[in-house]
């Protein structure tokens, strides 16, 4: 198995964003808020601040450490994008016969009358994520890309059609757009 002597990736920190590193815990603060993440599971990888950039590196890295260096650098880039502008997922409410009713109550997204069902379907909204319903669109926004994406996935999965032909029963709430808010 070949080893690389030194694998390094630099992530530039833009103006108005501050990054603090405590061991393997990275905290990124910006105009939209603050995101914190723990990378202590990444063995053999070092994270440090140098000038105006975050350096993610590994010495004598095998394939796993090389992959971790790139993944951690990508997570830090997403954290910086989030505190600068945020992330937005748009979902569309689709139905053919029974109109789907949705509402937001606290940390729950409640779906009623899905395929004419009397029971409610509930999707969990992750902390720090804002959900709005505008007509047949559901807009999910936040600064942590993973929480925003997980909330959108929870909403989409709550309307999964079971025991029916998906080609015929296309009712549901579907993600149709993802964007970084500038």
UniProtKB/Swiss-Prot annotation:
Keywords: Ribonucleoprotein, Ribosomal protein, RNA-binding, rRNA-binding
Species, as recorded: Aeropyrum pernix (strain ATCC 700893 / DSM 11879 / JCM 9820 / NBRC 100138 / K1)
Top-rank lineage group of the source organism: Archaea
Name this protein carries in UniProt: Large ribosomal subunit protein uL6
Pfam families, per database record: Ribosomal_L6 (PF00347)
Keyword presence, RNA-binding: yes
Any one of the GO CC terms: cytosolic large ribosomal subunit
GO MF annotation, one: rRNA binding
Family: Belongs to the universal ribosomal protein uL6 family.
Subunit structure, as described in the record: Part of the 50S ribosomal subunit.
Gene3D superfamilies: Ribosomal protein L6, alpha-beta domain
Function, as annotated: This protein binds to the 23S rRNA, and is important in its secondary structure. It is located near the subunit interface in the base of the L7/L12 stalk, and near the tRNA binding site of the peptidyltransferase center.
GO biological process: cytoplasmic translation
Biological classification of the source: Archaea, Thermoproteota, Thermoprotei, Desulfurococcales, Desulfurococcaceae
């Amino acid at each position: 198995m070949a080893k690389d002597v030194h694998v390094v990736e630099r992530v530039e920190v833009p103006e108005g964003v501050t990054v603090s590193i405590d061991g393997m815990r990275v905290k990124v603060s910006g105009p939209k808020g603050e995101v914190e993440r723990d990378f202590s599971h990444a063995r053999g990888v070092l994270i440090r601040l140098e000038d105006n950039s975050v350096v993610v590196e590994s010495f004598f890295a095998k394939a796993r450490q090389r992959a971790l260096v790139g993944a951690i650098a990508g997570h830090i880039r997403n954290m910086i994008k989030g505190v600068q502008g945020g992330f937005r997922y748009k979902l569309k409410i689709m139905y053919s016969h029974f109109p789907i009713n949705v509402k937001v109550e606290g940390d729950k997204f409640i779906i009623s009358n899905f395929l004419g069902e009397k029971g409610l379907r509930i999707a969990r909204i992750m902390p720090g994520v804002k959900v709005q319903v505008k007509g047949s669109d559901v807009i999910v926004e936040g600064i942590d890309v993973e929480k925003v994406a997980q909330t959108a996935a929870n909403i989409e999965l709550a309307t999964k059609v079971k025991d029916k032909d998906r080609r015929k029963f296309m009712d549901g709430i579907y993600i149709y757009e993802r964007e970084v808010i500038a």
